[in-house]
Every structure is written in C-alpha cells, then in structure tokens.
Amino acid sequence: MLRSEKTGCYEVPGGGIEAGETPEAAMARETLEEAGLIVIPASVREYGCVHRVQKAPWDETERFIQDNYYYLCEAEAPAAPQTPDGYVAQEGCVLEFVDPSDAIRRNRGAGEGFSEPMVLEREARVLELLIAEGYFD
C-alpha cells in the first residue's frame, strides 16, 4: 500500500482513467507511477467497484460522483522509481508492505485531521472485505 509520510494513512495506488484507457490499464499505469511496481497483466482480476457520491468539495450545492475500481494482481518487485504527481506527491506517499489490519486501524484512527476521511474509510472497508474473503490467509 501507499503510506502518507504526512499522516501515516494508507491507500492503494489509483487515479484517473485517461482518454482511451481501460480501467485495467489505468490501474497498471498508476501502480507503476505511484508504487514503482510493474503489474503482471495475466494476473489481473477485477475485484469490485465502489460508487462514491458526496457533496462536492468545491461547491456544497453540487455532488461529486466517482467510481473506484479495485483489482487483484501480482506485480514484479519494485522495478522503477516512484513518479507520483498531484495528491500522492503532496502527501509524500511511499510504498510499504503492511498488515491489512494495521492499515485499517491507522486509517480509522486518523480522525478528521485527514483531508478526505471518506477515502480512508473506503480503503478500510475494502480491506475488511478482502480479509473476510480470505485473500490474506
């Protein structure tokens, strides 16, 4: 997972889908950029999608709607330097192998100090599902 050096919170690599890009290709690109890991294409399996609807941070009268796709995959060991941009660069995110229960505890303990608490809760809930379904056994 990516750990923010500012907050100590955890997120999976992710980001926007570029024009003409599939969600799977976006996942592989973002994983390389943010974590320096090369996704093994034959290993990619769709896990699910979280549909996020909330007040828009830029205007309380508008809604922000986002679909967050999750994939299971294997990746080659860190093969490239991280080249994060935007939010991930600002947070000083670094790749860290972490026990999923520890990541859940840290994210839920972050409180309101984190700019996007719903993101942390989303990641915690996805990790809980993965644990319940035996993916970390």
Show the residue positions of the predicted features:
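N-terminal strand-loop-strand
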Residues: 1-12, 24
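Generic beta-structure capping elements
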Residues: 2-5, 74-76, 98-101
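Hydrophobic pocket-lining residues within nucleotide cofactor-binding pockets
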Residues: 17, 50, 75, 100-103
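Nudix hydrolase/Nudix homology domain
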Residues: 8-10, 80-137
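Membrane-topology and secretion signals of cell-surface/extracellular proteins
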Residues: 37, 44-48, 62-63, 68, ...
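Active-site-adjacent beta-strand/loop module that shapes the phosphate/pyrophosphate-binding cleft
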Residues: 51-82, 96
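The catalytic Nudix box helix
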Residues: 12-48
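Functional cleft and adjacent loop/helix regions within the main domain
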Residues: 19, 59, 135-137
